[in-house]
Amino acid sequence: MIVSGLAKGIDARAHLNADKTIGVLGCGINVIYPKENAYLYERMKKSGLILSEYPMHVKPLAYHFPWRNRLIAALSDNLVVIEATYKSGTMITVNECLELSVPIYCVPTAFQNVKYQGCNYLINNGANILVDINDVDDI
């Protein structure tokens, strides 16, 4: 089961490649955000689950996303971090998972890659290392 935020990039790919998936929104349930994920939103309406704690028509605001990440953490048995900068929303989810004792798995990367420095930081501080995509099924 994938639980993610229906965001661009890795979130969208995770939702697309999973059999079972939950998308947690940082806006009203009928607001598609980001717009480029409209196809994914429509697909998940039919074969997944879309959740929001916000009323209908509420637009996405920056302060909604940390709250959304709290729900993602609460619904997760494990957290897999593919990429994260030090100050990314992913790190907010990591902190929520730590509060809930949700195990964290990270993909290590080269030191100079800024987009992934958060992963190396988390591994250095006790996160589990994930080096083979096939291991995801065993988590």
Give the ranges of each region predicted by the language model:
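Glycine-biased, small-residue-rich flexible motifs in mid-sequence functional cores and linkers
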Residues: 1-139
